[in-house]
Amino acid sequence: KTLKEKWPLWITGTILFSVVYAISSFITWAVILAVVLFVAWLATKNKNMSLSLAFTVVALIGFSTHLYIPIRSELNPIIDENDPEINFRDENGKLILKNFNPNGENWRAFYDYLERKQYGSESMLSRAFYRRAQIDNQILVFPHMSYGGYQIAQYLPYKVGKVSYYQKGIYAIEADGNEPLERGPFKFPTLMASIGENELAQALIFLLFNGLLIWIVVIAWRKNLIVGIYLSLLYSICSAGLIWYINFSDGTKLERRDHASWVKEMDYVTSRFAEQGMVTSVTRTPDPNELLDIQRKIYADRAKGENSSKHEQNFAWQNWRKIQAMFQSAGLQSPPLPDPVHLEVRERDYFYAPAYIFMSLLYGLGIGFLLLNIQQRKAHMLNPSGIAIAVLCGAIPLFANYKEHNRANLWVPWDYAYNLLMSCEPNAIVFTNGDNDTFPLWFAQEVAGIRKDVRVVNLSLGNTDWYIKQMLDNPPILKLSHDKAGIDREFALSETNFNLPQQRIDYWVDLAEERIPRFMRRIESLSARLDSATTAADSANINAEIEKLNHPLQIFTALRNWGVPRRGGMMQTQYKLVIDLALNNPDKPIHLSTTVGLSNAVGLDRYMVQKGMILDLAKGNFAIAKDSIDIERTAYLVDSVFKFRGLGDGTAYVDGETRQLLYNYNSIYMRLAMSMKDVERAVHYADIGIKQFPEEWRNYAVAAEMLLSGGEVDKAIEYLERGLKEVSSSSGNRYLLQQLNSLNAKE
């Protein structure tokens, strides 16, 4: 009866929950609901109507905080992800009344932003129904994402740790990245190092933490059923609901869009084979996630020395082998397994903040129950017990987490951005990879005003139409071969243009093979004219024309060489963007951040020279040596320009993600050391690496190698012995020990 009387609350809750399942209709429904409830309340004075109206008004006020997003976007800031502005006026400043309709197309970009579609075209709710990770990795203990692992880390000095991926979707737990947490004389191993391969232990610890919460809720149920239901539902939504909704990836499965794209691509290829009369016994395209799972099991069996034939005989795996065989019989390179979506790029504990805050409230309630029990049984122990519990509740999390959360002297991201930008030539275009190597650069440019002449192009965002369009408007303005309509129509890959020929790599290979001879003929013709030039001015003009032609020839040559072994694949938008920007901006230096995988350079890396923290395209230069480094420019940057505040002196805490980023510094030092002919200068750069990264064994090995080349055996031995004391990784230690034993044996 009570539930029936509260029907307005149930209807109101269902409609207001549309902020999750139909965000584009939320404002319309909520406003209509508010009007209806207000009229109903005036007519009935029903308290359930008034409470429902209050909920609706508060929900609208809460949602209104997001309106700063389109207001900010309307001002066209340089960093304007998804471009979510809402245009209420035309170019002449007149109001457009239809644009006030919150269900209109004018609001679409705003809603897409709220649904995080700047990271993909799929809504968060839709994505939640396609699991992007193994469920145990999402719930128990796993790096960057696990609810249970972060739950433990809230209170205890046991951090989650890391895994290393050495094949697609296949990971291992290694010592590197799982260094124990030191607190005075105590060392606390990471959860991955201690129980990473023991799911039973993970489950037991998870049950311990959450069993206490269940116990607290059960007590609440016994004392007040309604309060108990409220607490259990709220915590379930904050925890299990968030795990399901956020749906973090563990690096073992594909994104839904990539899954659909790969299956569609394989269907297309196999149908082409069938049209060409090739015999095929492939009954259906295998599920790529299933293939990755089978491959993981095969590797696991082989690592244990067990027979993996039961997995290799799987129907899906056999179909995949047949597809690979068809490619080989057609004279094409066998397609590899698709790349799963990467493991979450950073720690995602902040997404679970509502659950952990509410969890703490429940633990506090449980402590209250405990103290109440103490008062009833041993009243004289109440005050001492309360004080002890209060002190422990504050001291343990402080002990576990203070060092990692103290930001004092943490200059590393600022200096990293400065160093990368200062590596760039004036007015350059520099391609970056993801968040960690991009946002610090944007901060340095827009907040600190450093090197705003450099255009940072993020390749992850380079797959989105809105980001590419902004390059045509926001300074530094770039030139593209398409206008905004063309970007939508054919440049940015989407479901509407998926079947266009230019979305296939073979189209671009054919284009390159058609353009290359044309450019070469023109260059040969100009070279012939150069031989007969009579004045220095004529020679200079002809050389300038040849240089202009060498630039696109170089780009198309790189594209062809990159594309031939990938002919059967899709031409991702970011690949087209790299080629397009390089072709249409000949006056701008083209750089690639050293954080970017070379495969993303679409073959241009073959003609690039490392200068500090970037690879610079040597335009039109076909004679450039592979993996070249400009020694003098890089040495000048390291010695006279770069900043390294807090590195090597113990003043800055460097977490795992930052350490991985900073290893780009170390690769520079090692390349410089190995490229120097002067032993003293070579050891100088190895010493910089040792100072900043004392646990990196390669620095000691390089220093010893350089000293040996100069005949300084004793000093080489000193470096190897020093490395053995500092280096904790077993593989590095073994190498240094092997080198040391070899030198001692010779003596």
Residue ranges and their predicted role:
Residues K1-D293, A300, W317-N427, F443-N744:
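ER/secretory pathway lumenal C-terminal domains and tails of membrane proteins involved
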Residues G305, S309-W320:
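Extracytoplasmic/lumenal ectodomains and periplasmic regions of secretory and membrane proteins
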Residues F439:
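Residues that form or flank phosphate/diphosphate-binding pockets in enzymes
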